[in-house]
């Protein structure tokens, strides 16, 4: 018993000397963080050459995207996060170099997902972070601005207000009572999300000069800024509030071509509001997200 007391005392002294605080008897408080990672808002991204497998810079920018995600993960962990879920939410959903992420992180990859870019979020999550986000499709100022699909959609509105991916995903998080505390992306994307959720912490990785041009930070500078802003957000986490929308929700979707709206209107769920647009109603954001996922992901030739 004497030996045990001496050993415990020695260990405590070593821990204090290393800067640790001894436990008070209670288990470490759980703190769960969800990080949704897109790519258009990553520092340096300006054209499709950085955004998909056919682009000559895609391989390098997967590294930069991963570096930005890792900066957010490490900062959240230092601030006390005990569980982190990362959703790879760009393109095919298989962009992050997951072997470079900490072993404790869990990663959501590929599609389809009922909750889209924030798949994995629920009421056990304490905070949401958006990395690499971009402006919405009708914003003339954003780099690579679009909403969900640059190829197919020209507008998405929630309860009569145009939404971006950032504000839509914030509303899904809000359904579960989860606040968005930090985001990164270009100046236009940040302004849009702040308009929806309030003055969250933000890392401006670049300033838009046009759809395909920007004044950008370097990858290292972007990652450093993201880490700093995540740290700041985590330190005042209690100051943020979840985005709540009125339910049931009404969603308007406009397509680049007329045929999708014509065919969707065959279903009683959808009302065709003009040649290129449909409207649907959902009981909440979870149901609305599932319907939007159907619109975006369904094809009759899907295999297997």
PLM region descriptions:
Residues 28-48:
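Mature N-terminal segment immediately following signal peptide/propeptide cleavage
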Residues 44-69, 201-205:
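A short alpha/beta connector and helix-capping loop motif
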Residues 103-121:
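A glycine-rich helix N-cap at a beta->alpha junction
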Residues 150-176, 185-188:
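Active-site glycine-rich loop that binds ribose-phosphate moieties when present
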Residues 172-180, 184-229:
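Active-site rim beta-loop-alpha module in soluble metabolic enzymes
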């Amino acid at each position: 018993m004497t030996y045990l007391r001496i050993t415990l005392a020695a260990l405590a002294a070593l821990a204090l000397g290393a800067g640790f605080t001894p436990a008070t008897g209670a288990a470490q408080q759980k703190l769960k963080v969800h990080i949704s990672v897109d790519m258009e808002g990553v520092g340096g991204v300006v054209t499709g050459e950085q955004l998909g497998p056919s682009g000559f810079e895609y391989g390098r920018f997967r590294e930069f995207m991963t570096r930005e995600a890792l900066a957010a993960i490490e900062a959240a962990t230092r601030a006390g996060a005990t569980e982190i879920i990362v959703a790879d939410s760009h393109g095919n959903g298989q962009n992050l170099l997951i072997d470079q992420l900490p072993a404790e992180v869990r990663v959501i990859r590929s599609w389809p997902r009922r909750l889209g870019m924030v798949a994995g979020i629920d009421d056990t999550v304490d905070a949401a972070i958006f990395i690499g986000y971009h402006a919405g499709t009708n914003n003339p100022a954003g780099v690579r601005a679009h909403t969900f699909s640059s190829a197919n959609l020209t507008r998405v509105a929630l309860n009569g207000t145009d939404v971006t991916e950032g504000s839509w995903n914030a509303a899904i998080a809000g359904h579960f009572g989860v606040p968005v505390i930090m985001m990164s992306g270009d100046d236009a994307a940040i302004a849009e999300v702040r308009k929806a959720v309030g003055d969250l912490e933000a890392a401006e990785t670049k300033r838009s000069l046009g759809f395909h041009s920007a004044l950008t930070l370097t990858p290292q500078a972007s990652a450093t800024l993201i880490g700093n802003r995540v740290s700041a957000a985590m330190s005042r986490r209690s100051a943020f509030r979840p985005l709540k929308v009125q339910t049931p929700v009404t969603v308007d979707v406009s397509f680049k071509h007329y045929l999708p709206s014509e065919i969707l209107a065959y279903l009683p769920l959808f009302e065709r509001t003009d040649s290129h647009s449909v409207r649907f109603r959902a009981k909440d954001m979870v149901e609305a997200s599932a319907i939007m996922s159907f619109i975006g992901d369904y094809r009759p030739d899907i295999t297997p």
